[in-house]
Amino acid sequence: MAGESFDVNWTDVELINQPTDMTCWAASAAMVVGWRDRLSLDPAAIVAGSGAWATYSGGLAPANVPAFADAWKLTQESPQSYTIDGLRELLQSKGPLWVGAAVPGLHAIVITGLYSDGTDDNTFVRINDPWDRDPGTPGNAGAYLDTHDHGTQYVLTLQQFAQEYEAAADFPNVNIQILHPEGR
């Protein structure tokens, strides 16, 4: 597969904004679980199904990710540096991916697609982000905004995505960074 062009794109992942400053994890899960179950899901339902709201009012602590994943029947992937083929295979076979990244603080986003001409420099990652961000152009996403009213779809280069993804592993207790359904 290395060196060949491809385009994996889950176009039917609903973009869902996060309702509060600290609910990116729930909104991102609502996108992934909603895709898997073929329904529109409110992030509040994710929170309610994950335990008491007070437990998660300050966000989802990395140590709580496994229990959260189990509650929603999402498979956990151990942190690792993905090759183009590895990320492509995971996305293609499992569906959209809930990802913990550092932007610079911990933040959950959803990978909905990956496309490439077969080279590292021309490989791009499609993102559904529950926070508002200037989408810019492919490989040139703009700054995060001070709002979370709509969420944003944008495209990062593989290198940009890898920097945000791998930087999250430097945070304490980050042992799980990717969650996914087992397809539909």
Specify the residue positions occupied by each region the protein language model found.
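Cysteine-nucleophile protease catalytic domains, especially the papain-like/related folds used
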Residues: 2-78, 164-184
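Peptidoglycan cell-wall recognition and remodeling modules
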Residues: 14, 48-57, 97-99, 103-104, ...
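Helix N-cap and loop-to-helix transition residues
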Residues: 41-43, 60-61, 82-83, 119, ...
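Noncatalytic regulatory segments and standalone regulatory/sensor domains
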Residues: 1, 55, 92, 114-184
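Active-site-adjacent substructure of cysteine-protease-like catalytic cores
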Residues: 77-132
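Broad hydrophobic/π-residue packing in well-ordered secondary structure
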Residues: 23-24, 35-38, 101, 107-108, ...
